[in-house]
Amino acid sequence: FASPFMVGINERWGTWFAYRVAVLADTDFEPTRPVPGESPCTACRPRPCVSACPGKAIESDEFNLANCVRYRLRADSACQTTCMARLACPVRAEHRYDDEQIRHAYAISLRFIEQYQTGKT
């Protein structure tokens, strides 16, 4: 399932899991079926992730990637090396990555955004 801030979310891990790899192969294997159920976000109120997003990337039930990127690129951004919306998500918060791991992952994604913006990919 996708969270309002477009990070995967599930009932067991919340947003604190990572997709590692996708393999494309010409085989006869059946694709894995999606996990049945409903997104934990469906019943979440008052949706603390929405109010925690300083970049106003989550409004009117839609994620605005341009707002997210614009805010992350600001020199004074609170989201350069983290995501305030993700930190505010109450679903399985006990699985939250430690601060060093969060800073590491978000620093890499910020570097990719900067490279994309400047055309230096």
Can you say where each PLM-predicted feature lies in the sequence?
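Catalytic cores of enzyme domains
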Residues: F1-G119
